[in-house]
Regions:
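Nucleotidyltransferase catalytic core that binds NTPs
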Residues: 1-206
Length: 206
């Protein structure tokens, strides 16, 4: 029987590829908010990223996440969105999780950059009804602006927005894909298990 009153963090993303920034963010959320687990949720067909040319296949993205989190007992791979044939939306996923796991409190992790257009997402008020929103801080100089936006969204969407303190790691999946194509080293930016898989599968090298 599933434990009730669990606190679960949800880390969604295309993870193309998953990198140390994602892992550090997940661990920070786990520690700061006393979570039981952090679920890594590879996106299926997000409406804003429909063009997958030059990217990893879905199965490859899943395998990279599996390898990246394998050594962490409180990190969990969740392939829920990969099973959805339709375009995926966060509110649908979170509402389905609430139904499947009653008594569980969900914490949806987003980056500070996403916060500023969060109210433009599909049904953001339903996301807020299904989960508390953890906002990862990045640029300390913009903290005042960030807190003001969190407060505005909380009032407008009737949600709970909480600040997640994280180191300012300037790394992106897009940049790492370019480096791999150019033959540059990505050591320490990606787990070794992910690097070896990318090399074996020749991902991003076209």
């Amino acid at each position: 029987m599933e434990k009730t009153n669990r606190k679960i963090g949800i880390m969604g993303g295309t993870f193309d590829p998953i990198h140390i920034g994602h892992l550090i963010l997940g661990e920070a959320a786990y520690e700061q908010f006393g979570l039981d687990e952090v679920w890594f949720l590879p996106a299926g067909n997000p409406p804003h990223k429909r063009n997958r040319a030059g990217r990893a296949k879905d199965a490859q993205r899943v395998e990279m996440v599996r390898r990246a989190i394998a050594s962490n007992p409180h990190f969990v791979l969740c392939t829920k969105e990969m099973k959805d044939e339709d375009y995926t939306y966060s509110y649908r996923t979170l509402e389905a999780m609430r139904k499947e796991h009653p008594g569980t409190e969900f914490y949806f992790i987003i980056g500070a950059d996403s916060l500023f257009y969060f109210d433009e997402w599909k049904n953001p008020e339903r996301i807020c009804a299904a989960a508390k929103i953890l906002v990862a801080t990045r640029d300390r100089a913009k903290e005042k602006e960030l807190l003001a936006c969190m407060e505005r969204n909380a009032k407008k969407l009737h949600g709970t927005f909480l600040k997640l303190d994280t180191p300012n790691l300037d790394v992106s999946s897009h940049e790492l894909r370019e480096w791999i194509r150019e033959g540059k080293s990505v050591k320490y930016y990606l787990p070794d298990s992910v690097i070896s898989y990318i090399q074996e599968q020749k991902i991003y090298q076209d």
